[in-house]
Amino acid sequence: MSGAPSYETRFCSHCATALAMVEQAEDGGPKTRLRCPACGWTHWNNPTPVLAAVVECVDQGNQVLLARNAAWPGRLFALITGFMEAGETAPEGIAREVTEETSLQVLGQSLIGVYEFKRMNQIIIAYHVTARGPISLSPELAEYKLFAHADLRCWRAGTGLALADWLTARGHVPQFIELPPRT
């Protein structure tokens, strides 16, 4: 299948048989997906919902907090992100993520938008979060920086587009940086 993403799931979660690419009739016509040849289970490979936050620190002159993930090479700073937990709403999830990753007290939030991130097979649900308090990073983050709105730079994918939309809604013309190619 041309352009098919690489799959991490290799075995059926019901019977442990090795999965195979099998074409089968679906509502929209025939579709080739990873399926179990023994029991018929289908690995749908649906996009994962990811939460992201433009964190505006109200006790730091409304500067925006960007952080660098400890696993990332170089000095790229981005929005606070994380996965929803079972049983929580997206607003609850982003408040939890911001507090877990930065120790900030979340005061309010509003939806910026929903963005595709095809490379990671994710759907990003982005919020503007107002917060305050001392910043203490979780081990998953290496460092953070606070930026005035005019000093923020966006990137042309995923959460960078959410940051650009947030800036535009506040009357700023987003400035973009070019990220190095992924190797």
Language model feature labels by segment:
Residues 1-12, 53, 153, 166-172, ...:
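A broadly conserved sequence feature marking short terminus-proximal activation segments
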Residues 2, 46, 57-100:
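Conserved Nudix-box catalytic region and its N-terminal flanking loop in Nudix hydrolases
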Residues 2-53:
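Acidic, metal-coordinating catalytic segment for phosphate/diphosphate chemistry
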Residues 22-23, 104-113:
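A short coil-to-beta-strand element that immediately follows conserved catalytic motifs
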Residues 115-136, 149, 166-167:
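Active-site-adjacent beta-strand/loop module that shapes the phosphate/pyrophosphate-binding cleft
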